[in-house]
Amino acid sequence: MKDNKIIIFDTTLRDGEQALGSSLGINQKLQIALALENLGVDVIEAGFPVSSQGDFKAVQKIASKVKNSTICALSRALDKDIDMAYEALKVAKHFRIHTFIATSTLHMQDKLKKDFDEILSMAKRAIIRARSYTDDVEFSCEDAGRTPIDNLCFMVENAIKAGAKTINIPDTVGYTLPSEFANIIKILFNKVPNIDKAIISVHCHNDLGMATGNSLSAILQGARQIECTINGLGERAGNCALEEVVMAIKTRKDYLKGFYTDIKCENIFKTSKLVSAITNESIPSHKAIVGSNAFSHSSGIHQDGVLKNRQTYEIISPSAIGIHDNRMLMTARSGRAMIKTCLENLGYDENTYNLDDVYERFLRLADKKGQVYDYDLEALMFLSYENEEENEFVIEKLSVISGNIPTACVCMRIKEELKTEACTGNGPVEAVFNCIARITNLKPVLKAYSINAKSSGVDAQGQVDVDLEFKGRKFHGKGLSTDVIEASAQAFASAYNAIYRSLKVEERKMA
């Protein structure tokens, strides 16, 4: 290994899972592990085998399937934990036992009820036992960020003597600041005589929002492994986010000179989405690197700059993490340059329309609708569509019966005619979708469906967003109601109306 390679140790399946309301299934964990292997993660911490039979089996299955990443299991500094970790890991091509014990005064006295000498003895015994199973042993000083520095140095020195090849320095409660954490690592390298015999790792939590900053500050002082999770999942406020620290190393080569990882960055976005879907943990829209707004531009000034040179407002190319679609949002803040570019992308010559006229009508629509899509812009050009009330399909009545055979009955007004259909589905939402498809005689494919609470309490409103694909083009719909089925029906109707208007535009083009 070259000195400046940063080992990426992913603990999504262990520390990340601890943040979830319920445990993941074995096959779900395997799916994530295989995605992490494909991403290029060096070490995958697959779980804590002694904690449950389910975790043991998950670690065992992952160990048997993953070939290119080292599989790691966590254990306390107890013989039974270490033995159980080995039993789960022994089928792996490459495996690591990760044992830990708390070293801060607070944890030793109030949690473990032991003094430093007892803790030191337990740590050495655990490392020696783990070494009887493998040369790849990692030792963590839990709550290192609040451990007296002389004690920490002595513990690290003795852990290395006992045979630990990786020493992990966790900021367990996210307490330290970057300069402070960097100084801890610096002191370790200056005071621990055998520090060169082990790789120094860091595991930073995000309680004060410093996890990524602390991790990066540590590698500047000699740390060469970063422990992190996809999307920053983890206890309380989470862990250092893999996507953030990896892209920071890749993007700021001017400052983080010579450092690199083996992560295949083009797989970051799809891995993030996969983990979000499996864990049922939504990604905040403003989340760095992978949030839906991370590469979105709605300000007219920003859009104009990006259209001229993307680097004016983008320090990372979306394609670098595997995003290839356009993230320019058309809102009331968009300027003429954005509208002109969108029309050009749709194939309209600037000599065929009056930009000032189109822009004026666009602003009126954007004020009412919020976000405007390219098909809305085309409708403005051909249909003078400016009002959300100008809909071909309007839901008049809706009823749903749940149970063994979910059934929906939808009554829609199409112009002046009322049409009613009843359909079944795998759930009430699908039943409603099937009704609308039959009434409209349009057969789009549902590509995305999401629900977000827009208020709190028993009368909370939920917003449903859907993406429908029709003839190779995506159409968005939005619905808002205290009833999720009603909100879903509104969202479907909104998207169907967008499809209908696009068909009318095509008719006008052909005329």
From Swiss-Prot:
This protein's name: 2-isopropylmalate synthase
NCBIfam families from the UniProt entry: leuA_bact, PRK00915.1-1, PRK00915.1-3
Family annotation (InterPro entries): 2-IPM_HCS-like, 2-isopropylmalate_synth_dimer, AIPM/Hcit_synth_CS, Aldolase_TIM, LeuA/HCS_post-cat, LeuA_allosteric_dom_sf, LeuA_bact_synth, PYR_CT
Stretches for region Regulatory domain: 394-511
Subunit structure: Homodimer.
Residues that bind Mn(2+): D15, H203, H205, N239
Domain of life of the source: Bacteria
